[in-house]
Amino acid sequence: EAIIISVTVGKTNGANKSSYLNIVLQDATGTIDAKLWSATDEQIRLFERGQVVRGKGDIINYKGMRQMKIVKLEPIEINDEQKALFLPQPPVEKAVMQKELDKYMKKIHNIRLYAIVHGLIEKHYTAFVNYPAATKNHHDFASGLLYHTLCMLKLADQLIEVYSYLDADLLYAGVILHDIGKVKEFTGPIVPAYSIEGSLVGHISIGHAMVKEMAEELHIEGEEVYLLEHMILSHHGKQEFGSPVLPQIPEAEALTLIDNVDARMNMFEKALHDTEPGSYSARIFGLENRNVYKSRN
């Protein structure tokens, strides 16, 4: 049993030009590419992203990679909570992470910043604690957005300790809300796609609008709001990476750095997990198409 995370239709080159399905199947242990040859119109209609299936097939080696030649495949109807069990899970239980998030929110002593953060997290809590942080590359698993945020908050702790001039309230608030726009950018927690709003606007602009709207709803105005908006808008660090402005305050620079560190280290972790000791991983797109080496130690 597995969940379909990707499916495309192809045509064979022969005279009959029959249809086939390229399917990527996933369970909690990983993914495998699969082929369903001579797919019927009903199968093409039936098998889609997010569908849980039960089947069997033969595992073959294709260009050095494992591939499954599907012999039989049938859909299973289950709810989203059960579907989530087929996805990679975070290394920390969700309930533990939820308590950690609450602890960090309470570290924000600036009442205006706290009100905005609390208001947005409360309003979008279910999505925030269940959505992945991305559809691929980094933290692309159940509750990945929450886990990514907490890892960043722990990195923020260390920067605040070393660089005592940083505004801890602003940095904590920026970390917690930096990806809040992803609760609207993605379609849901299970095998998410980009929403229309997500594709057209993007999570940075969405998140900025959410902060601005919450501040207006709470009748909060002034420099703190501008600074928090700046944190959201600049957190990708460069305009070519999607930020309309560059970091102009140290807290925004710190946010950019720790976001990048955590995302990239997660990509290294994923690559090592799927690689045998003493060998190299496949090329990692998010790491400039590098191959990652896994030592024998």
Segments the model singles out, each with a brief description of its role:
Residues A2, G50, M152, D259:
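Divalent metal-coordination and catalytic microenvironments
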Residues V7-S19, G30-L85:
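OB-fold single-stranded nucleic acid-binding module
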Residues N22-D27, G188:
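Short, acidic/hydrophobic/Gly-rich beta-strand patch recurrent on exposed beta strands
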Residues Q67-P132, I206:
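Extended, charge-rich, solvent-exposed interface segments
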Residues T126-Y147, V191-S195:
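Active-site flanking loop/helix segments enriched in acidic
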Residues N137-H138, Q158-T275:
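Divalent metal-dependent catalytic cores for phosphoryl transfer on phosphate-bearing substrates
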Residues L150-L153, I160:
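Helix-hairpin-helix/helix-loop-helix acidic hairpins
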Residues T256, Y280-E288, S295-N297:
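N-terminal intrinsically disordered, cationic/polar leader segments
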